[in-house]
UniProtKB/Swiss-Prot annotation:
Signal peptide per UniProt: none
Positions of disulphide bridges: none
Main location: cytoplasm
Ranges that cross the membrane: none
Protein EC: 5.6.1.7
A UniProt-annotated Pfam family: Cpn60_TCP1
Family the UniProt entry places it in: Belongs to the chaperonin (HSP60) family.
InterPro entries on file: Chaperonin_Cpn60_CS, Cpn60/GroEL, Cpn60/GroEL/TCP-1, GroEL-like_apical_dom_sf, GROEL-like_equatorial_sf, TCP-1-like_intermed_sf
Organism from which the protein derives: Aquifex aeolicus (strain VF5)
Any one GO CC term of the record: GroEL-GroES complex
Protein name listed in UniProt: Chaperonin GroEL
Amino acid sequence: MAAKAIIYNEEARAKLKAGVDKLANAVKVTLGPKGREVILGKNWGTPVVTKDGVTVAKEIELKDKFENIGAQLVKEVASKTADVAGDGTTTATVLAQAIFHEGLRVAASGANVMEVKRGIDKAVKKIVEELKKLSKDVKERKEIEQVATISANNDPEIGKIIADAMEEVGKDGVITVEESKSAETTLEVVKGMQFDRGYLSPYFVTDPEKMECVLENPYILIYEKKITNVKELLPILEQVVRSGRPLLVIAEDVEGEALATLVVNHIKGVLKACAVKAPGFGQRRKDYLGDIAVLTGGQAITEDLGIKLESVTLDMLGQAEKVVVDKEHTTIIGGKGDPEQIKARIEQIKRQIQETTSDYDREKLQERLAKLSGGVAIIRVGAATEAELKEKKYRVEDAVHATKAAVEEGIVPGGGVALVRASEALEDLKGDNHDQQLGIDIIKKAVRTPLKQIAYNAGYDGSVVLEKVIELGKEKGVSWGFNAATGEYVDMYEAGIIDPTKVVRTAIENAASVAGTMLTAEALIADLPEEKKKDITPTDMPELD
């Protein structure tokens, strides 16, 4: 085991502060509409130009092991906020730095940091309550477009495309962001449930021009295992032929005489059919088949149920208005499942998303959720250069997350105004003792920092702007604030300067959590740098007489 270095008390906190400041100072310059760009140099490839706080934070790794602990903890604030809310990473970083700075100041004066932390937690709880009171539901398309525009660093083109996507697939629908092969940014919407499996034989094609197999009002057989023996398949085929409707077979694989029988009957016009492989692998395949069964009102014939293929009846098959199968995709449109069962399945997947700790699992669960909820929207981001494309793609991804957060929990006035208004409620909040009161005062001061930083990045005096915003709140209403893009004081809702409540809430909660943890730390432990062993080269060899 490598030797460790340990530092304590003031020395430990000073190192944490140095690390926090190095990261936060690089990130906070990007805050607001007039935030500056940060250029990230790479060992290979072109440098990346970005205004995205979490992208900047992720690049930072400090040489000093103790300072790096502080930097990594604040990086965690940015990453966690991005994961939960999709935006607000820079705000969270600014808040964490401000809370930690103020906390260090009171700790140096001899306050009990454990009581100070209790005061901080109490104040954050109150701030969150106030944010909920300030929050306004997002229902109108115009508001969705405004949120998306702001989250994409005031790019109205991206705002409009995201609003279109949300309108098409709804709040639970999946919006994926891909790189376009052209300079244009476009939107493509796939209605219904689509999975990445195409027909098993080109002989199933019904539209030679588009190379698609289109089945109108088909039955859908959902089977977990391989189908090779035609005898197993024959009973259900005969029932489907009598019904006069087409058949889609979804199975692990369809091969041999079973596939040949389907193809021959399809070509002769006896039974319009198509066979595709089931999506996914292992347990994930079972989940997908279960989703398809719920969506189409059928039954997934799995080994667990003990049902043999030859004993399957028509009422076990799923049904849909239409199925379109091409070489690579299968799309089920208008599944005829029970809406209540679909709703229950959606709720079950939502719970799994909340409980999972794996990013990969979360992504796959969200894909399943979207497919059940009614569609997938693909935003293809285009730009003139590779560097611009990467930066724009980051912004679009952020904006999609933030817009979903706004639809989920509502919106508050942007530009740091919501936190300033919420902080006014702390005037009446009393701690159990003097040190807790110091913690409450820390939050009261810290939550006003984002507004000051936005003003400063735009070239204005943050303290002067803050005073004016507090004054306007009393005179004209809580939604009045400072538009850093124009330098004017406006009604933030009317000017379209808004933040998703979830973003602001997550930012303050995560920032206070990490800053409080750092304040109460009394020791830091890090690996000692390894001493490099001197290589013995031929020149180092002793000379022989």
